[in-house]
Amino acid sequence: MDIKKSLVLIFSAYGCFLSAQEKVIDTVYIFDNQMNKVKLFHSVNTIRPKDFEKNATNLSELLRFQSQLYIKENGRGAVSSPSFRGTSAGHTAFVWNGININSAFLGQGDVNNMPLFGYDELEVKAGGGSVQYGSSAIGGSIHLNNNLEFNKGPHAFLYSEAASFGTFNNFLRSSFSNEKFSVKVSGNYVISQNDYEVPEKEYINRNGRFYNSSINIGASYKIAPHQTISWQNQLFDGSQHYPIFTENGNKTKYKAQTLRSLLSWDITKNDFSNSLKLAYTEDNFQYFGDIDKPKESGAEGKNYIFRNDFNYFITPKLNVNGIGEFQINKGIGYQSGIGDISRNVGSAAGLIRYFVTSDLRFEAGIKKDFVENISSPFLYSFSGKWHPIKWYEVGASFSRNFKFPTFNDLYWRQGGNPDLVPETSTNLDMDHELIFGDLRLTVSPYYMDIKNYINWLPTAAGYWAAFNTYSVEIYGLDSRINYQKDFGNHHFTFNGGYTYSRSTNKVTGMQMMYVPLHKATGNIDYRYRFLSVYVQGLFNGLTYTTTDEKRADAIDPYFVLNTGISAKFLNHYTLGFKVNNITDVVYQTVSYYPLPKRNYSVYININF
């Protein structure tokens, strides 16, 4: 489907939804209904819109400073991918409103081509999750959620920011809801010349310009007391110029367009619920070897997704949950040797939950995927949570997860390998949560064993090809701490996290590339009446960039500090000022691509 035509269809349908009803009670519709069940057994880090503004440039910056992920960014705003608990980019599932949206070509998501302000909240779940969320949910999953509120009337919000390096970020959202109907429309536009310099590295971010725009539309209508029809759409268009190292270097760029549309019919009663979802997603991208010439390569992917999630309480203590999904994945490549291809993917999952008491519960799940021309493994998960005493809660999970080969892995010419088998992992996760008054501490040790790692290796014929290769053993520790305290008009919040990841190639015994052994984050917020101040800190430990742990090529440890101050006036207006990298540290997340030194921004937001 042509993206511009899709935009016309979206706005036309949006106009048909408008209506008016009487007010009754406040409710919120959340598209990803499975996440509420996941939270019964697993620790989830939720990042809300008020925290988006601290790291508003892109999703990479937000996740870097406010989650346990390591984000590999080839220069500010350029290609970016996550490493979750020592895994590779393809072992993190991106889930949009309950739908897995990892690229069929790459098997991963480009973090900087996901519009930060396109979502109402982000949730970061560590550990295996393939039974609920499918392929790639090995290291963890990132949930990009939208919600629709009822009975709130009209509301609008504007965020506008001007920042260093010719960066401008504008976001507008408008919503209306009553008893039966809710609609929300938003748009975001970001542009940056991105021409920063790092003299210590003799680096200028030449040809670093980027821009992107997105439109989001959501609507929900209560067709009966226990039934809701909901619709969510996202349209994204972006362009990233790839940095060059010399003044006369060849300037290249990458363009991406994304369309996501989801229709959901939900029935919710006392003892059962059912959510039927129909989704269409489209991902187009083009690579330009010369920014002034036609594209050199590219691809177009289309996915048709049907998913049903049925949940039933047999007794107040015993709950069964069945999830069925069918997808048609279509793709066509340009100058990649990938022809017009299609793949059918089906899955059936069953989960049973037993609530022994209000403080003790268990869950067991099984799943079988049916991927055309690929033999898929049998998956399972076993979880439990116990709250034995007031200040302590413990949870544990044992699961098998997988990632099936991508279109590029299978069909790229030359080098694609149709004989590849899925990667599989065995995961063991634990959560120890301690609560002392206003202090909450979560400590989560974990273990993973990943087999049949898919890698591209040189061949005797002179080209690179995809193979199932070695196994990887990963163990480590995640921890999070939260403290909140109010003293009259003084409000204080601290959120911190520490991650240790030992990720070892079982053949060589060496640490995997771009997996820091240590990472720590801290966010302090203080508010007094109309005035707010925050400070962010990020420590990243030694990070190897080669397979042989060569120290000379490794990224040295670094500590980055950000701060910001804002003032709210006349109840509706907030004016803020931010300083990023206060101490002017030279740092990078990918070799040869330093990130900006000290930089500034000023912003205003208006609620009306």
Predicted feature descriptions by range:
Residues 26-53, 81:
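N-terminal periplasmic "start-of-domain" segments of outer-membrane beta-barrel proteins
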Residues 60-99:
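Extracytoplasmic beta-strand/coil segments of soluble accessory domains associated
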Residues 71, 99-127:
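Short acidic/polar hinge/loop motifs at secondary-structure boundaries
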Residues 128-131, 141, 146-176, 187, ...:
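Short strand-turn segments of transmembrane beta-barrel domains in outer membranes
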Residues 192-198, 202-214, 222-303:
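Flexible loop and strand-edge segments within Gram-negative outer membrane beta-barrel domains
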Residues 247-268, 387, 391-393, 397-451, ...:
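Outer-membrane beta-barrel signature, preferentially recognizing the C-terminal barrel domain
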Residues 357, 447-449, 468-545, 571, ...:
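Gram-negative outer-membrane beta-barrel transporters
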Residues 450-451, 539-546, 565-608:
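C-terminal beta-signal and adjacent terminal beta-strands/loops
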